[in-house]
C-alpha cells in the first residue's frame, strides 16, 4: 500500500513537472465578446469559481457499437441494456494516464477541492488561480437587454500534455441560453369554453379536435383505444423542466377533472437538481411544464410520471435567431444528465420527454458532442430520449455564424443528435398535415446514421437539386416521427389556454412509448430503450404517413411569424410532407395499435 502511494506520488510529480514545462496552447477562443453582451466588471482574484473538465473517453466506438446492438431488433443483444451506471461507464472511462495527468496538473496549481466522477473532473478554486491555470482572463459580462451577468473568459489554454486528454473545460468561453419549443401561450378562443369542452370529452365527442386538442382526441387519432396500463407494471415516464418552470398540482387536478376524467387522482413526483425547485406559487411561466405533465398523464395514465426540475443556465454562441441570451435561455444539460445517469435502474424512468431546443450552430461543437454522448449513455440504460424537433420550420435565422455569413438552413439541437428521437409536428385530423413550423433538416455536426440511410436517401432522390448548398445532404436527418402540434388545451394557473408547438408533440409521443413499455414489461420483455433503429426498420409500418402540408421558414423573421431578424430570405423555402420519411414529419404519426403489435414481436 505504502509502495503504491509512493508510486502514485512520483507519477503525479512527474506529470506536474511535464505539464508545467511544456508550453500551453490555446484550447478554445472567441474572437470578440458575443453579440448582445458587454464587459461589466473585473472579479476579485479571491472570488470562487467552479469548473468541470470532460476527459476523453477510452472506447467510444465500442460503446456506440454495444448501444446499437442492444437497440437493433434483429440483433441477439436486443434489449440487453446496462443495468447500472458503473456497467454503462465501463467502456467510457478515461485512461488512468488521463486522470493522473489532469489531476496532477490541478494539484500542481495548489487546487485541492477536486472531484473525480468517471469521465469528468470537477474542481473549485478562485478566479485568480483559474486565470493562472488556464492562461485565461475571467471577467463579468452583462447582457445588454436582460442585464444577466456571467463570469466568462474569451479564451483559455491547456498544456500540451493535458490537452490531449481533455474534451472541454466549462463554463469558460460560452455565453448563452434559449426557449421552450412552443408558441406564446394564448387565451382560449371565444368558441371554446372549459365546461363545454369537458362535456364533449365526457360524451366521447371528438368533433372539435380540429379546433382544440384534448387527450381523448389523441387517443382516438392515434388508435390507443381502451388500452389500460398497469400503474405497478414498472413502466415510468418523465419530463425535463428548465428555466425555472414548475408543473402545478392544482392545474393537473383541474385538467383531470375537465379533460381526463379517467385519470382523476393521479399525481406526479418531482426530482430536483442543481438548485431546481418545485415552486407552486411562482409568478414565472409554468406553461411548458404544465403542458408536458398534462398530456403525458392524459395519454399514458395511470403510468407514474416524474418531473425533473433542474436549475441553472447553460451555454450558447449567439446567432441572429437567439441574439439575447436572457430572452433565449439555454437549459443546463450537463447538470441534468450527469445526475439522471446515476439513478438506480428501478427508479430510472424509461422515457424522458424534453421540449426545449436551439439552433445547432449556437452550441460549441465540443459541448454538443459531449451532451449527445450523454444521451447515448441514457439509451444504453434503456431510456428512450424524446425531443421536440423545434418550431422554426426550415429555419429562422438562415445565416451561418462562423464568419462566412452563408445562407443556410440551420438544424436544431439536441433534435439532430443521432441518439435522441426527434418529434415534429402536425395539424388537422382528417387527414393530418405537416404544420408550417415543424423544424426539420440535416445536421452539420453528425453524419447520417446507417439506420436511417435508406429512408433518407429516398427522400433526397425525390428532392433532387432543390436547395443544393443550403443544407448538408450527408447529415443526420430529423425529425424521426411526428404528432399533433397545435391547439392543445392546457390549464395553467387555473385558466384554460391553448398551446402550439412541437413542445406539444414530444410529450404526446413520449406517453405512447410509455404505453409500449408497459405492454412489454407485463409480458416480461425488456423496455424499448433507444428507439431509432427499431423505428426505421420493424416499426416503420406502424405510422400514419403524412403527405400533405409542409414546413416553412427562412423568411427573414423569427419563428412563429415574429419580428424581422435580419437574416437572408430564401423564397418559398419549405420541407414538404411526402410519401415516406420527410424533414417535416419524419416517418409520420403513431398508430398505437400497429406499434403495439410490432413491439410485442421481439
From Swiss-Prot:
EC number(s) on record? Answer: 3.4.14.10
Q: Which residues form a coiled coil?
A: none
| Catalytic reactions of this protein | Release of an N-terminal tripeptide from a polypeptide
The Swiss-Prot or TrEMBL record annotates one GO molecular function as:
endopeptidase activity
Identify the stretch annotated as signal peptide in this record.
1-23
Q: How does activity depend on pH?
A: Optimum pH is about 6.
Indicate which residues the UniProt annotation says bind Ca(2+): 545-546, 580, 582
Claim: Metal-binding is one of the keywords in the record:
yes
State the source organism's domain of life. Answer: Eukaryota
What are the UniProt keywords, alphabetically? Calcium, Glycoprotein, Hydrolase, Metal-binding, Protease, Secreted, Serine protease, Signal, Virulence, Zymogen
Reproduce the UniProt comment on modification after translation: N-glycosylated.
Instruction: Name the predominant localization.
Output: secreted
Q: How is the cofactor bound?
A: Binds 1 Ca(2+) ion per subunit.
Cofactor(s) named in the record = Ca(2+)
Instruction: Tell me where in this chain the Peptidase S53 domain is found.
Output: 212-602
PROSITE patterns annotated for this entry?
SEDOLISIN
- GO CC terms on record? extracellular region
Catalytic EC class: hydrolase
The subcellular location is: Secreted, Extracellular space
Glycan attachment positions: 267, 405, 576
The protein here is known as: Tripeptidyl-peptidase sed2
Q: What organism does the record attribute this protein to? A: Aspergillus fumigatus (strain ATCC MYA-4609 / CBS 101355 / FGSC A1100 / Af293)
Amino acid at each position: 500500500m505504502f509502495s503504491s502511494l509512493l508510486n502514485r506520488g512520483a507519477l503525479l510529480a512527474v506529470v506536474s513537472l511535464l505539464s508545467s514545462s511544456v508550453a500551453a496552447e490555446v484550447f478554445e477562443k472567441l474572437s470578440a465578446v458575443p453579440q448582445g453582451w458587454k464587459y461589466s466588471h473585473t472579479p476579485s482574484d479571491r472570488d470562487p469559481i467552479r469548473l468541470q473538465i470532460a476527459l476523453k473517453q477510452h472506447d467510444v466506438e465500442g460503446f456506440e457499437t454495444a448501444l446499437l446492438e442492444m437497440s437493433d431488433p434483429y440483433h441477439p443483444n436486443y434489449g440487453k441494456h446496462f443495468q447500472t451506471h458503473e456497467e454503462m461507464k465501463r467502456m467510457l472511462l478515461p485512461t488512468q494516464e488521463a486522470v493522473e495527468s489532469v489531476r496532477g496538473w490541478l494539484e500542481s496549481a495548489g487546487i485541492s477541492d477536486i472531484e473525480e466522477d468517471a469521465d469528468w473532473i470537477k474542481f473549485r478554486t478562485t478566479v485568480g488561480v483559474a486565470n493562472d491555470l488556464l492562461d485565461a482572463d475571467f471577467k463579468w459580462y452583462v447582457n445588454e437587454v436582460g442585464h444577466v451577468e456571467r463570469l466568462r473568459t474569451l479564451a483559455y489554454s491547456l498544456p500540451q500534455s493535458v490537452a490531449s486528454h481533455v474534451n472541454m473545460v466549462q463554463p469558460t468561453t460560452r455565453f448563452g441560453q434559449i426557449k421552450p419549443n412552443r408558441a406564446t401561450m394564448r387565451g382560449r378562443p371565444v368558441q371554446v369554453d372549459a365546461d363545454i369542452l369537458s362535456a364533449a370529452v365526457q360524451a366521447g365527442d371528438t368533433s372539435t379536435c380540429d379546433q382544440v386538442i384534448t387527450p381523448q382526441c389523441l387517443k382516438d387519432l392515434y388508435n390507443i383505444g381502451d388500452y389500460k396500463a398497469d400503474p405497478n407494471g414498472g413502466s415510468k415516464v418523465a419530463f425535463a423542466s428548465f428555466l425555472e418552470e414548475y408543473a402545478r398540482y392544482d392545474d393537473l387536478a383541474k385538467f383531470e377533472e375537465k379533460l381526463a376524467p379517467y385519470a382523476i387522482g393521479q399525481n406526479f413526483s418531482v426530482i430536483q437538481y442543481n438548485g431546481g425547485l418545485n415552486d407552486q406559487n411562482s409568478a414565472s411561466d409554468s406553461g411548458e411544464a404544465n403542458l408536458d405533465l398534462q398530456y403525458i398523464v392524459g395519454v399514458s395514465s395511470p403510468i407514474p410520471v416524474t418531473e425533473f426540475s433542474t436549475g441553472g443556465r447553460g451555454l450558447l454562441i449567439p446567432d441572429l435567431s437567439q441574439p439575447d441570451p436572457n430572452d433565449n435561455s439555454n437549459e443546463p444539460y450537463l447538470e441534468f444528465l450527469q445526475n439522471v445517469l446515476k439513478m438506480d435502474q428501478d427508479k430510472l424512468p424509461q422515457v424522458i420527454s424534453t421540449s426545449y431546443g436551439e439552433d445547432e450552430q449556437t452550441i460549441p461543437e465540443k459541448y454538443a458532442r459531449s451532451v449527445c454522448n450523454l444521451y447515448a449513455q441514457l439509451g444504453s440504460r434503456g431510456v428512450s430520449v424524446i425531443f421536440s424537433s423545434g418550431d422554426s420550420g426550415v429555419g429562422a435565422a438562415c445565416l451561418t455564424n462562423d464568419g462566412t455569413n452563408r445562407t443556410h438552413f440551420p438544424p436544431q439541437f439536441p433534435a439532430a443528435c443521432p441518439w435522441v428521437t426527434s418529434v415534429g409536428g402536425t395539424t388537422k385530423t382528417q387527414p393530418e398535415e405537416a404544420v408550417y413550423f415543424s423544424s426539420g433538416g440535416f445536421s452539420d455536426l453528425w453524419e447520417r446514421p446507417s439506420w436511417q440511410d435508406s429512408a433518407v436517401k429516398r427522400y433526397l432522390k425525390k428532392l433532387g437539386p432543390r436547395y443544393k448548398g443550403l443544407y448538408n445532404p450527408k447529415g443526420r436527418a430529423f425529425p424521426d416521427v411526428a404528432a399533433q402540434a397545435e391547439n392543445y388545451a392546457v390549464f395553467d394557473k387555473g385558466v384554460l389556454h391553448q398551446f402550439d408547438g412541437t413542445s406539444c408533440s414530444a410529450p404526446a409521443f413520449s406517453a405512447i412509448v410509455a404505453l409500449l413499455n408497459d405492454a412489454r414489461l407485463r409480458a416480461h420483455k425488456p423496455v424499448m430503450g433507444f428507439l431509432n433503429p427499431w423505428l426505421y426498420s420493424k416499426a416503420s409500418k406502424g405510422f400514419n404517413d403524412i403527405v400533405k402540408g409542409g414546413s416553412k421558414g427562412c423568411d427573414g423573421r423569427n419563428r412563429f411569424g415574429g419580428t424581422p431578424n435580419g437574416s437572408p430570405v430564401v423564397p418559398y423555402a419549405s420541407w414538404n410532407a411526402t410519401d415516406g420519411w420527410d424533414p417535416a414529419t419524419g416517418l409520420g404519426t403513431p398508430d398505437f395499435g400497429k406499434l403495439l403489435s410490432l413491439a410485442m414481436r421481439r
